[in-house]
């Protein structure tokens, strides 16, 4: 099933229809009618991700049984009359949804059901993301493509997709730890009585899981050391770190559903910064490891990164991890190795 809806508004805001501005880019989203996908689509269409001067075509992938729901979402997108939205593709075929894609947000994933072991979940998702990796390899725009994996286990799903796309640079794949990063910023701002924009040089190391390591040791608040400003290592170790690590579970316990709006917002932040840069500021991205800081080559591991204004990321170099940090780093590294081992027979 494949449906394309095109627009040609005549409003003054529609600069592209009047022959001005940029050509549209193609943004593919999997699990498009799900909770996170629903939150994402409207923000992308409004220009929150790529800017108010960038026309887009949304290319939505769903399961066959969810195509009617996707039709309803597409109707809502139509009804918003977004000037930047030049078309919508609805498909249950990965190669169609990824055709010519410049951006791909892989949101849809198999959730863990009652009684399911983690190894079973890994293998179920390995099958999904191997298919999607092959489809990206065959039909996406390899020269411009940026892939963000949101569906969990995100780091290992990114690894699987990338390994199944041998003709695409593995550095064009990433997994999302920006939600963890944003959660940490909010906790630190609250603790220090400051704005989130006052917090700098904070980062997430490792896996998007309960082993992730939110690291404040290099951080500053209004230019002053976070460690010195907080001056409470017990709070950092016993409150802050577990709160960030377990925030997703806490939200499920509170609302009965997993994070959706905050996850979508983090995905927007991740892709916007990866495209336009971070103005010299640190952010956290799970990216292809070349062995930096001892993270095994080939893993998708969260590092502190800076992105330049051309969209090229660089891992922050020269950081010295203390013993506590190194222990946390090693724990999350070992978990990622274990996950990779659990799906090794499905990796090319």
Curated annotation (Swiss-Prot):
GO cellular component annotations of the record: extracellular matrix; mitochondrion; phagocytic vesicle
Q: Which organism is it from?
A: Dictyostelium discoideum (Social amoeba)
Query: Which gene name belongs to this protein?
Result: mdhB
From the broadest rank down, the organism's phylogenetic lineage runs: Eukaryota, Amoebozoa, Evosea, Eumycetozoa, Dictyostelia
EC class name: oxidoreductase
This protein's name: Probable malate dehydrogenase 2, mitochondrial
Signal peptide span per the entry? none
Which transformation does this protein catalyse, written as a reaction?
A: (S)-malate + NAD(+) = oxaloacetate + NADH + H(+)
As for family, the record states:
Belongs to the LDH/MDH superfamily. MDH type 2 family.
InterPro entries, A to Z: L-lactate/malate_DH, Lactate/malate_DH_C, Lactate/malate_DH_N, Lactate_DH/Glyco_Ohase_4_C, Malate_DH_type2, NAD(P)-bd_dom_sf
Q: How does it assemble?
A: Homodimer.
**Residues involved in substrate binding:** 112, 118, 152, 183
